[in-house]
Regions:
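N-terminal beta1-alpha1-beta2 module of alpha/beta enzyme domains
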Residues: 1-64
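Structural motif corresponding to the early beta-alpha repeats
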Residues: 63-76
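Flexible, glycine-rich active-site loops centered on histidine and acidic residues
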Residues: 2-16, 73-91
């Protein structure tokens, strides 16, 4: 597991289009931030969104901060984490 460093950005994306979220992630990466935090409490599915954002960035790491254990079975959480880790090269 990689260490999550300082210099991250926490944001909500529920009002953004997918293209706007990609542009934001690319800008955050360009500015040198290490991590983009996306909450699960409102808006879009963070795991699906992270897959799209990871495909359009090269070094930016992603975190949910909160993943609601009452809405997601632990096995499904593991599947999502494993899939995203593979798709993003461990980011």
């Amino acid at each position: 597991m990689r260490e999550i460093t300082t210099g991250g950005v926490w944001t909500h994306t529920e009002t953004m289009s997918g293209a706007d979220a990609v542009a934001l992630a690319q800008r955050i990466e360009l500015l040198g931030y290490s991590t983009l935090w996306l909450p699960e409490t409102a808006g879009k599915d963070p795991f699906a969104l992270i897959g799209m954002l990871a495909a359009n960035t090269t070094e930016l790491r992603f975190a949910t901060g909160i993943a609601n254990i009452f809405h997601r079975h632990p096995g499904v959480m593991k599947q999502a984490a494993m899939t995203l880790a593979e798709q993003s090269g461990g980011r």
